[in-house]
Structure formats: structure tokens, C-alpha cells
Amino acid sequence: MQAIWLNNYPAGVSKTLDLDPAETLLDFFESSTTAWSDRPAFHNLGHTLSYADIDHLSQQFAAYLQDSLGLERGDRVAIMMPNLLQYPVALFGCLRAGMVVVNVNPLYTARELEHQLVDSGAKALIVYAGSAHVYAEIKHATAIEHVLVTEPGDLLPLVKRLLVNFVVRYVRKMIPKYAIGSAVPFRAILKARMSAYRRPEKLTGKDLAILQYTGGTTGLAKGAMLSNSNLLANVTQVNGWFGGRDVPGKEIIITALPLYHVYALTVNCLSYFEKGALNILITDPRDTKGLIKEMSRWPFTALTGVNTLFQSLVRHPDFAALDFSTLKVVSAGGMALQADTAREWQRVTGTQVIEGYGLSETSPVVSSNPLDLPEYNGSIGMPFPETNVSIRDENGVEVALGVAGELCVSGPQVMLGYWNKPEATAEVMTADGFFETGDLATMDEKGYLRIVGRKKDMIIVGGFNVYPDEVENVVTEHPDVLEAACIGVPDDDGDDDEVVKLFVVVREGSAVTPEQLRAWCKENMAAYKVPKKVEFRTELPKSNVGKVLRRELRDEQVAG
């Protein structure tokens, strides 16, 4: 498409970027730790590691992988832990050794973990003790040769370390029993000889850095191959877009999203690392009271999150008492931002949530609204610099402005392909080099994009296309509604047509009826889009980052 968005970029955002294809994440890390050596880098559980600490510990970790474990450049190393100080140490240690990081969700079941470890061919696993029992169930089915087990307090000072680990294991009983005979404590890395570290030679930007597995919404998760250049390009894009308000070396970002999720990995861990920022790592963001208490200790300047995180914060009675005077950047992604959430956030904090869009396959950020957005607009913003988009119909033909079609993306942040899946890669890459996202979108005359639904979630009612996102956005505007999701189900009249079924979570004390919700919909959308069936729920199925899982609702309907 013609890049009409370039003419509407906010002041200070360059239309082009100076990207060095030879630069690696190792170069990036070394320059950042040198520049910000004495600055605090990561804080968790009451303890802070400086950039110099991260430099030292990650080199020890790299040396341990190379010397003690005998791993080689290109070997895959899986990291399975929540936000702890050990995560950046392990991440950067692997990258400094020239190895490939496989990010693993610590909430995975044995089946999910087995698939990811087998598919990636990982040789080593660094696992949080609370998840070790899951690995123990499937250890003989994988190619894992080395296991390092970490407990929450492993990088804390002695007294605090012993106390935290004791409380987690014996008081809160958060560490189920497990049997992994060859497991090594994470703190073994502290005995590694620094002199044993060997900086990998001839690393290039094209080299694979991370296997970021997709959410598996359409079957088994696939490993998106993200190169050094992919990730560094996105870091440059993110900092070029949001950097105008930043003061290098002075920023404090609240990292409530898990670092194993590509959104937090690129934006919080990498982009803010380059700026010398302090990352406040939140181990359990579902503990809203604890999250707010931690936020109260810091003059935080930035926060990333998803809709459900922002909802839980603004609805908590303690949140409004926080000091928001230093808050400059609030970025949302991972799922659609609801209008009522955005407006309530602005009312309480005086800041605007800036919604963006991305995928695992794009490192992840593709687009964002400008920082000076005056109010919520329902858009995912404009494509980033050096990013091209094309909205195409089912025949691959580009559609006109305002017409819905599949969002296709090209740019330096687009993955190399899916790990060991050339056929799956070919299915999503077009002949002219675009990645087919599977999301349906429109573009307006200024270049702003709007997601109207997933291609596979689209509901066809009487020959008309109904996009779940649109219906859900209308329903969540109702004052009695907290959350909503809709899917297509067979009509009861026995023909092959679909109808819209709505699942709703209402506010406490609400007496709203299905008929009232349908009447609300009739006032705000065409008749064929109005849900024919309405079901009230106490909660909706969600992913670990709070994204509503429509596929589980569909599976329930099929199962009867």
C-alpha cells in the first residue's frame, strides 16, 4: 500500500532508521553495560542488580554453559521462569555464549512443555523450581542433557535469599516435589571461572538469537525464528517511536508482563536496557495489591501491559492513591484495549494508554499510536518506520482504504521463518515478501490501522461477515459489562448458517438481562451482527497474559 502513514507521523519520529545489519545482540549488550555500568538495571524481591552486576553474572553464566556444560554456539537453551533477577542473567548469558534462547512459559502443562522442548531440540533447561515437577513428568521424552533449577531468592543477599526461599517452599508451599536426578542448582554458575568465557567469533545479525513460540491458537505452537537483526531492528523502531520523552539513564519501567513473552522481552528488557533504565520485575502480576504496593515505592516513568492488567489496576481501591506525576509512557499490546478501560485509566491517572500491535513473528511490534494521542481512538496506530503493510482480500489482492482484509506485514523485524517448518513458513509468507498475520484489519486515510478480528474467528451470518472484536467492543461499552467474547455457533433451525453467541461477565450486583444486552447491540450495530444467544459467565478463559481464548469457548460448544 502507499505509505500514507509517513505523512502523519508525530513530530520527532523519523521516517527512516539507521539499521546496522552486522550488529548483534552481543554488541548491543556490551555497549549498553559499558555506557550504564554504575546504573541500576533490574530490581526484584527487594534487591537491585546494576548493569555491571548483569555484565559480571551473565559472563559467569556464559562461561558455565561453555566450560562446565560443554555447550556450543547455536545450541538451544530453554529458559522457563517468571520475572526474577535470574531471567536477564540467563538470557544475556546465553546470547553472550552464542546460543539460542528458547523462551518457555512456566505455567505450561507437561504436554505443552514436551512439545516445545522436543520441537526446539533444546539441550539445556533453566527452570524455576515451582515448575520443575512439570519437566520431571516428561524428562525422558526430551533431548535435554542439563537442567539448572532456580529458586526465587537465588540472586538475593544471603539472609534474604534464605528467608525468601524458605517462605516460598515451606510456608506458601509453592514448590511441588519433583525428582530430577541430574539437576544442578542455579547458583552453581557463581563458581564458574570468568576466564573460561569465550566471546563467539564471527557472529552476524543474521544469526538466530531466540526461538519465540507462538501461542498455539491454531494447533501446536510453532517456533518463530528471531535473528539478532530482527530484534535489534524492533528495538530501534520502539526507541525511535517512544524515545522522545525519555531521559537516558533516568527511566524506571514497571515490568509486570512476563519477560518470556516477546512484548516484554523486546520493549521492557531490550529497548529500555539500551536507555540505561531500571526494570522493576514483578514476579506475580495477578497479585494486584502486591503490584500496587511495589509501584508505590518507585517514581515510575513507564508501564507496559495488556487490557486485563490495566482493568485490574484501575478497579483496585488502592490504585488511585499512587503518584502518577512521573508517568510518561503507558503502552498496551497483546490483546485489544477496551474503550472503557482506556477511558477509566485516563480518568484515574491523567495519562493515555497508547495501544500498539504485534506478533511473535514480528519481534513483536508492527504499529503503535503516537505518544501525543489525545484520547482513545480504537486504533492500533500507524506502521513503524521501515515497516510496510498491505491489506489484502482472500485472493491476495490489495483492498481499498476502509475495507477489511488480511493484514500483511514486511519489514526488518519479520522473522526468518518457523523453526524446522518450511511448509508452515511458506503458508504465511507471500511471493512478494509479506507475512500474512491472520488478523483482519482496515486502514483509514491517515494510515491508522484497526483490527476487526482474526481471519479464523470471523463469523458468517447470512452471507455477511461479522467480526468478533467489533461486537465485543460494543458490548463492553455497556455500563454493566466487565468482559465479553463472542463466537459463531450453528443456528438452532438446523441449516448451515452461523449465529453470534455472546459470553458476558457482568459487574457485581448487575441485574442486566440478555434481552437488554441484545437491545443495546441493536442500537449500536447492524441487525445481523446482534448476538442471537447470550450466556453469562463468572469468568472467561484466558491465556497467561490475560488474552481471552475464543478457541476454548468454541471447543466447549463442540463438546456440548
Q: Where do the PLM segments sit?
A:
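Gly/Ser/Thr-rich phosphate-binding loop
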Residues: 166, 277, 300-304, 314-375, ...
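Conserved ATP/PPi-binding loop(s) of AMP-dependent carboxylate-activating enzymes
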Residues: 382-386, 397-428, 466
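Conserved AMP-binding/adenylate-forming core of the ANL superfamily
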Residues: 38-72, 78-84, 88-92, 109-114
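Conserved AMP-binding/adenylation subdomain of ANL enzymes
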Residues: 232-252, 262-302, 316
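AMP-dependent adenylate-forming
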Residues: 3-7, 27-50
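AMP-binding/adenylate-forming catalytic core of the ANL superfamily
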Residues: 108, 115, 411, 416-417, ...
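Conserved adenylate-forming
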Residues: 68-72, 193-206, 211-255, 277
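ANL superfamily adenylate-forming
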Residues: 7, 136-205
